[in-house]
From Swiss-Prot:
GO terms for biological process: rRNA pseudouridine synthesis; snRNA pseudouridine synthesis. It is found in: Nucleus, Nucleolus. PANTHER family: RIBOSOMAL PROTEIN L7AE FAMILY MEMBER. Residues 1-27 are annotated as: Disordered. The keyword RNA-binding applies. Transmembrane segments: none annotated. GO terms for cellular component: box H/ACA snoRNP complex; sno(s)RNA-containing ribonucleoprotein complex. Keywords: Nucleus, Ribonucleoprotein, Ribosome biogenesis, RNA-binding, rRNA processing. It comes from the Eukaryota. GO terms for molecular function: box H/ACA snoRNA binding. Component of the small nucleolar ribonucleoprotein particle containing H/ACA-type snoRNAs (H/ACA snoRNPs). This is Putative H/ACA ribonucleoprotein complex subunit 2-like protein. Belongs to the eukaryotic ribosomal protein eL8 family.
């Protein structure tokens, strides 16, 4: 049997198109609606499209700053224990729910506004990496104070719908 000579070079553009890689979170109407249908039962209050877009923008600005954004359950719990002021953003499609089901109770107890976003993948993209993120805590900063106040005020007016 003869040896085969294989060309193992790949075109990078075809790989990224095939994987469906995205570089920014999307809030397109149809896609956002599809993501909202996949959330778990405790994901209340769920951000609407307009609010989600503002939240993604806030996360993007906070991730550029130093120590204004905390990511992950361990870091967010630490910030909540320290009574830090901020906004808590949770992903709505996390399974099992028990991983972070206690966080909304802590946020309500400490009067910290919180909101659910439909997709953990979109939340990770908003931070600036491809890794999904289930929980983010954004602290106020002078760089994005106006946007922070606008989002915090909108979150204070959200209500949890009874099932």
């Amino acid at each position: 049997m003869g040896k085969r000579n294989l060309d193992e070079t790949m075109n990078e553009s075809t790989v990224s198109e095939a994987n469906g890689d995205a570089t920014a979170p999307t809030t397109e109407k149809d896609e956002y609606q599809a993501l909202c249908e996949l959330v778990n039962p405790i994901a209340q209050p769920l951000a609407n499209r307009k609010l989600a877009k503002k939240v993604y923008k806030l996360i993007k600005k906070a991730s550029a700053g130093d120590k204004t954004l905390r990511e992950g359950i361990k870091d967010v719990q630490k910030e909540l224990r320290r009574n830090e002021k901020g906004i808590c953003i949770l992903a709505g499609n996390v399974s099992p729910i028990d991983v972070y089901s206690h966080i909304p109770g802590i946020c309500e107890e400490k009067e910290i506004p919180y909101v659910y976003i439909p997709s953990r993948e979109q939340l990770g993209l908003a931070v600036g990496h491809r890794r999904p993120s289930i929980l983010i805590f954004v602290k106020p900063s002078g760089d994005f104070k106006e946007l922070y106040d606008e989002v915090a005020e909108a979150l204070r007016h959200l209500t949890v719908e009874a099932a």
